[in-house]
Amino acid sequence: QVMAALFPVEPEQETDQASVMAWGCDPDALSADPYQGAKDAVYASVAKLVAAGADYRKAYLTLQEFFEKLRDEPTRWGKPFAALLGALDAQLELGCAAIGGKDSMSGTFHDLDVPPTLISFAIAPIQAGEVLSPEFKEAGHPVYLFVGDALAEHPMAAWDKLRELHKAGKVKAAWAVEHGFAETVMNMSFGNRIGFAMGPDVDTNWYTPWPRSIVAELTEEIDFPLAIRLGTTTAEPVITIGGDSAPIDELLALNEGVLEDVYPTRAGESAPARTLSWDCLLYTSD
């Protein structure tokens, strides 16, 4: 969910200082409500940094916006206004500033309009050794949902707790929830083919987006009011949710197959190897 990179240094020098960068944008949410969609976009980008082990208090943002031509229609003007207000509210709540951005306000061609779009990019510094990858690491570990409750007295309390556990070496993997717990668990299972079994007393909607929330694999059980135990990692490469089971390999094939025709990852068996030439003619004034 993030891009992590060491900071560049002079030759013969070394550093363990790195940066993590992530984005957030839900086109459906923005079309339904530009204010809430933009607010969620900011939170989604920062939540991914938190899931990677970064401190959200050190994050900065840059925003990219696309909107239809505004003309003289109040409803059209209201869309970017609402979106920017939502993004600003999120920044004030998080204490994270957007230090740059690009406004693309000409998203209209004849009678075609782009949907309201605000993409949040977040970046934060981190020690390279603290970067946390999202795939499940080991069978038999408890998996928790850290609930980012916008209505709580301390909305970022779950993020603070997760960071505390990470600093103590008790977090093995984490993923910021975007499209529901089922999608989250599936993606976390792919990397090491480690399965997941839902707990017997879990009563929640596995296919509803939970902005601000993070699913994490821990090394031990915890008792925290904003952490819900979802289940346990398993050695068997199978995901079991609500009595339904699916092999990880089948889910991975379906997941990768969506864009296989657009961006092929495998060459056909009879595909010839082409020889490419980069020779070009050199023209001079003579």
Regions found by a protein language model. Give the residues of each.
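A glycine-rich phosphate/pyrophosphate-binding beta-strand-loop-alpha-helix module
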Residues: 32-107
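Intein/HINT protein-splicing elements and their conserved insertion hotspots or analogous self-processing inserts
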Residues: 1-18, 22-30, 75-82, 97-210, ...
